[in-house]
């Protein structure tokens, strides 16, 4: 058996304290935080709100103020009994909502939570209003899937977001593989948008009229719409939607615009040109499909403000924050911080009207089937148990 000298024992005792530092962008404090409260060299522990502090690039490493038991607004620490839509409304936002899909609505344990309109005040149909679901054959429309979710929203007193009119993906082959003149495709877009939006007239708060028009490098996607009509297809779709339902808000919805870059710049320039030409456009949707630990809340806030300055409202439309599996306590804690950062960014921008998660439970998340080895992206786990992320959301609305 080895015997440690007094000096070695003292050195060993110091090791945990040396190692117990949060990495850059890691959490370093806040109400309920039990992890490290100092940051690695070159970063500073900055308090964003009483519920979390984060190691941001800077010159010094300092500990955050000791957490108190109340929020800055005087409320108590959010608990798992919090109702997110109720909190969002109390904070001055229009809604907290979720996407859902028709196949999920046969799961009674799922719908028992989904139907709670104090938890979710808004619903987005994930797939049943897309082109392949609504006009699978030219001129032949079917609305059964969308109607089911629209009825659910009406029954529960929830806002409904329409998703979507024009998108490069999930198109029936007669559209995606068609060979059209500009006049023909213009008529096809007008008929599809008009028929779809008219069918749900008076039921939909906002439509994602155009979805994901740009590549990540800021160039336009080369799909049947752009290849045939150039950029004018956006105006065609927006004008058709406005004529069909003058009271619905009209959005362009995009991902990877949560930070400054070529894609965000291209979309911003499009917004400016559309507004200058008096083309109807009311909002920009920030999808926010994010990765744990790779996200800047202040960066998102800046982007929300930049777009809002163009005279449009903004919304978080498809929020989830994925991680490399398996999940760990550290990853779940960081995910809590990241969800809180998104809510805080929206809270700090008056024109950010609400937040929608892209389904609320890991059981029905799209992430594992799209990103190999990743998942656990939602605020509830696959057994419908609230994760730390839930409290991150609640704290953001309560701050």
Curated annotation (Swiss-Prot):
Disulfide bonds: 346-352
Reactions it catalyzes: Endohydrolysis of (1->4)-beta-D-xylosidic linkages in xylans
EC numbers: 3.2.1.8
Gene3D superfamilies: Glycosidases (3.20.20.80)
Compartment annotation: Secreted
Residues of the active site: 212 (proton donor), 318 (nucleophile)
Keywords for the protein's UniProt record, in alphabetical order: Carbohydrate metabolism, Disulfide bond, Glycosidase, Hydrolase, Polysaccharide degradation, Secreted, Signal, Xylan degradation
Gene Ontology BP term (one): xylan catabolic process
Main location: secreted
Span of domain GH10: 81-396
Signal peptide bounds: 1-20
Taxonomy, superkingdom: Eukaryota
Pathway(s) served: Glycan degradation; xylan degradation
Stated role: Endo-1,4-beta-xylanase involved in the hydrolysis of xylan, a major structural heterogeneous polysaccharide found in plant biomass representing the second most abundant polysaccharide in the biosphere, after cellulose.
Residues annotated as domain CBM1: 21-56
Name of the molecule in the record: Endo-1,4-beta-xylanase C
Annotated thermal dependence: Optimum temperature is 70 degrees Celsius.
Lineage of the organism: Eukaryota, Fungi, Dikarya, Basidiomycota, Agaricomycotina
Recorded effect of pH on activity: Optimum pH is 4.5.
Pfam families found in the cross-reference section: CBM_1, Glyco_hydro_10
Source organism per UniProt: Phanerodontia chrysosporium (White-rot fungus)
GO MF term list: cellulose binding; endo-1,4-beta-xylanase activity
GO annotation, cellular component aspect: extracellular region
Record carries keyword Nucleotidyltransferase: no
PROSITE patterns the record matches: CBM1_1, CBM1_2, GH10_1, GH10_2
């Amino acid at each position: 058996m080895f015997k440690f000298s007094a000096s070695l024992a003292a050195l060993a005792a110091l090791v945990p304290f040396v190692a117990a530092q949060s990495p850059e962008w890691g959490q370093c404090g806040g109400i309920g935080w039990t992890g490290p409260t100092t940051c690695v060299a070159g970063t500073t522990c900055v308090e964003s709100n009483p519920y979390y502090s984060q190691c941001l690039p800077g010159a010094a490493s300092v500990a955050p103020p000791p957490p108190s038991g109340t929020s800055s607004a005087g409320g108590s620490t959010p608990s798992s009994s919090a109702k997110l839509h109720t909190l969002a409304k109390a904070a001055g936002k229009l809604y907290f909502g979720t996407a859902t899909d028709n196949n999920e609505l046969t799961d009674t344990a799922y719908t028992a939570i989904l139907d709670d309109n104090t938890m979710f005040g808004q619903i987005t149909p994930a797939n049943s209003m897309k082109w392949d679901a609504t006009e699978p054959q030219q001129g032949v429309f079917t609305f059964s899937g969308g109607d089911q979710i629209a009825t659910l929203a009406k029954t529960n007193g929830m806002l409904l977001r329409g998703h979507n009119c024009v998108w490069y993906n999930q198109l029936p082959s007669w559209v995606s593989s068609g060979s059209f003149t500009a006049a023909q495709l213009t008529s096809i877009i007008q008929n599809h948008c008009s028929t779809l939006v008219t069918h749900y007239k008076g039921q939909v708060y906002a439509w994602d009229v155009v979805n994901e028009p740009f590549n990540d490098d800021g160039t336009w996607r080369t799909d049947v719409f752009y290849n045939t009509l150039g950029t004018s297809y956006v105006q065609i779709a927006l004008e058709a939607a406005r004529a069909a339902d003058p009271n619905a808000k009209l959005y362009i919805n995009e991902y990877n615009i949560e930070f400054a870059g070529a894609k965000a710049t291209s979309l911003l320039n499009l917004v400016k040109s559309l507004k200058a030409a008096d083309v109807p456009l009311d909002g920009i949707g920030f999808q926010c499909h994010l990765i744990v630990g790779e996200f800047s809340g202040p960066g998102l806030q800046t982007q929300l403000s930049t777009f809002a300055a163009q005279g449009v409202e903004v919304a978080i439309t498809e929020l989830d924050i994925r991680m490399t599996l398996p999940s760990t306590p550290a990853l779940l804690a960081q995910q809590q911080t990241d969800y809180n950062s998104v809510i805080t960014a929206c809270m700090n921008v008056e024109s950010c009207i609400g937040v929608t998660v892209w389904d609320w439970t890991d059981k029905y998340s799209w992430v594992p089937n799209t990103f190999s080895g990743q998942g656990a992206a939602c605020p509830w786990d696959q057994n419908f148990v609230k994760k730390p992320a839930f409290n991150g959301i609640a704290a953001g609305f309560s701050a």
